[in-house]
């Protein structure tokens, strides 16, 4: 809504930004096994929200060359924006999480769980990603180019094996 009074417009924008600050649909954190409660995975499952948990990152190396402490990356995904301080921090506290990250791209962060786009980093198996609350790791991480590559592989297989037709039972 346009304002004639520029000060009122600035105040309105400031209130709007303050309300939105710290609110997003996707949040990430790190969990160190030695400082997390034994049942931290169960606590996440009991939330009934979409969560992805990386495989244990136990092969990561710091820039100095020394190994990083083993840790998990956790991605929480919600259907609507949530406030970090009042809604997300209590969850992170209950699982012994360290730090927070507001995630703009669920796909990008989900791919980071296994370092799919970082070949210089230790690689982790996507099969080991824990999916909770209806989160679909493969559905989130699949890129349009993956479909093209799959179709190309199928066509190569058909050609190499001289398959001309098939019969469905």
Where on the chain are the PLM-derived regions?
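Catalytic "initiation/cleavage/transfer" segments centered on a nucleophilic residue
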Residues: 2-27, 32-41, 89-169
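Flexible, charged surface loops at secondary-structure boundaries
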Residues: 20-23, 45-47, 67-68
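Histidine-centered divalent-metal-coordination microenvironment in nucleic-acid enzymes
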Residues: 28, 51-92, 101, 110-114
């Amino acid at each position: 809504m346009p304002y004639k009074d520029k000060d009122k417009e600035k105040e309105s924008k400031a209130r709007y930004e303050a309300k939105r600050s710290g609110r997003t649909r996707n949040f990430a954190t790190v969990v160190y096994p030695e400082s997390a409660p034994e049942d931290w995975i169960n606590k996440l499952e009991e939330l009934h929200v979409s969560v992805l948990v990386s495989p244990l990152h136990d092969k990561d190396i710091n820039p100095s060359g020394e190994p990083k402490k083993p840790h998990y990356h956790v991605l929480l995904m919600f259907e609507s924006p949530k406030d970090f301080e009042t809604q997300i921090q209590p969850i992170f506290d209950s699982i012994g999480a360290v730090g927070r990250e507001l995630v703009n791209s669920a796909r990008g962060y989900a791919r980071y769980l296994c370092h799919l786009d970082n070949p210089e980093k230790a690689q982790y198996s996507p099969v080991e990603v824990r999916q909770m609350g209806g989160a679909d790791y493969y559905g989130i991480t699949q890129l349009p180019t993956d479909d093209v590559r799959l179709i190309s592989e199928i066509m190569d297989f058909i050609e190499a094996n001289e398959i001309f037709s098939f019969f469905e039972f």
